[in-house]
Amino acid sequence: LALEGSTAHVQAFAPRPMLFVLGLGDLAEALAAQGALVGIEVRATDDPAEIGALGPTDGLVVLTHDHEVATPVLARVLGATQGGYVGSLGSRHTQRERIARLVAAGVADPESRIFGPAGLAIGSRTSQETALAIVAEMLAVIRGRKGGHLRDDAGPING
């Protein structure tokens, strides 16, 4: 940037990604630790009112299996944004039930917008491994990547 013979350098910074976690416990703690490693701010809560709107680099992971708590939060978040990452923990049966409830609540196309069961398929066995799989999936989604093996991807290795 040049101003009347002076030169100034401008460096823009993207906002830090935010991951909202609905539910507390070991996995929420592991998500906070994993998020910190890669520069994601994690806010874990049991209070649905604390879940904010998602920006294009933000995410939500629903850990609770209580449909009465999860459905309104997911409906609100999916209704307010087309971007970001939305994941939900639970079995495939739980995911089908969750999708059916969201469709009944009038949410458009929830099955293509929710990543559930959340996380990349790395064979997770511990809370820490599950957190790694979820954070990696979130990063892949917000960066427009598939999250597969680099050897199978012709795109850029970094970024």
Model features per residue range: what roles?
Residues 52-97:
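Rossmann-like adenosine-cofactor binding region
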Residues 24, 46-47, 64-66, 117-118:
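Fold-independent oxyanion-binding glycine-rich loops
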Residues 20, 43, 59-61, 87, ...:
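Hydrophobic/aromatic beta-strand patches that form the interior of the parallel beta-sheet core
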Residues 24, 28, 66-67, 95, ...:
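Generic structural signal for well-ordered, non-membrane alpha-helical segments
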Residues 33, 37, 75, 79, ...:
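Short, well-ordered alpha-helices that flank and scaffold nucleotide-derived cofactor binding pockets
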Residues 83, 89-159:
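Adenosine-phosphate binding glycine-rich loop
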Residues 1-46, 50-57, 102, 141, ...:
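Segments forming oxygen-rich coordination pockets for charged ligands
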